[in-house]
UniProtKB/Swiss-Prot annotation:
InterPro entries: EF-Tu_GTP-bd, EF-Tu_GTPase, EFTu-like_2, EFTU_2, G_TR_CS, P-loop_NTPase, Small_GTP-bd, T_Tr_GTP-bd_dom. Residues 174-176 are annotated as: G5. Residues 60-64 are annotated as: G2. The gene is tuf1. This is Elongation factor Tu.
Amino acid sequence: MAKGKFERTKPHVNVGTIGHVDHGKTTLTAAITTVLTQKFGGEAKAYDQIDAAPEEKARGITINTAHVEYETANRHYAHVDCPGHADYVKNMITGAAQMDGAILVCSAADGPMPQTREHILLARQVGVPYIIVFLNKCDMVDDAELLELVEMEVRELLSKYDFPGDETPIIKGSAKLALEGDKGELGEVAIMNLADALDTYIPTPERAVDGAFLMPVEDVFSISGRGTVVTGRVERGVVKVGEEIEIVGIKPTVKTTCTGVEMFRKLLDQGQAGDNVGILLRGTKREDVERGQVLAKPGSINPHTHFTAEVYVLSKDEGGRHTPFFNNYRPQFYFRTTDVTGSIELPKDKEMVMPGDNVSITVKLINPIAMEEGLRFAIREGGRTVGAGVVAKILE
């Protein structure tokens, strides 16, 4: 079957469902696609199609994730749903599916549960900027006061992790009723309310090309008579010939000028997000630039060595370590294109970290890396991946 052409007319937003096991994340995902495809076209996905999430690999880690898409009047959404709790942890930490916003599904019959809390914490740590709540299974709760109580608990939990609990949209409904075609307040109406909240509460994300220029250095060549060429894929922004750029990371930051941009052996006047380019630098020696540094718009990103991070440690079955690690463990941290050694400090109450755990850590690198909160990395030992992480907070 031919794939339908992707019409890029509406702005695109990435979202996903999070929340405790059996609170109805997958049922809600199916209900959203069912209701919205009837209204705005597209392809509905049944519960079992979503539940049989295919395996994918991100940073050497196998994750089960289901991807669905749907449209509202104003936007095109890509939505991820994970079958198991471990998949969520891995997904959010590796950034396999970057979310511009999350739909927290919480059963009105049960209230917030351990994974509800853990997913909110993870969302905070990995930088998911917005959360909308769908209070599910409201058809099973007759007591209005109980509903109010659950709503209050969820708001308090969000506020505890620095989300604006009081302003967060909370939609009451029943994914099951909506999926069965119920047109009432808790059925289809609730799904439309949710779609409306997605459209209005989650801002349209900045496109990569609109960000400040950043390109991780992959390779460096010296071309006689022309100077030094640095190759890589532009991560965000635009670089124009004649602009000043900084070389950041590993060594002290230096300023240089872009004197040429090449792509497929053709000269261009600029390179932009997504392009694989060679950038010619004026007056820069080949030994001044190395893999692992970045080229960036001056002042837009700084080098750091000390940060806190949320990490997932691979289990033995995933090819990770067979034994736990302890405080002051010194692996390599793979940022963008290179490894840097660093030491790990565990939280006070944590004596050791077992394969398969996720944990908050503090890291000190031996060399600075151009870094921002939300930057992903792999943890490696002698070239093999033993974990994945995301920078939560920069300390220095």
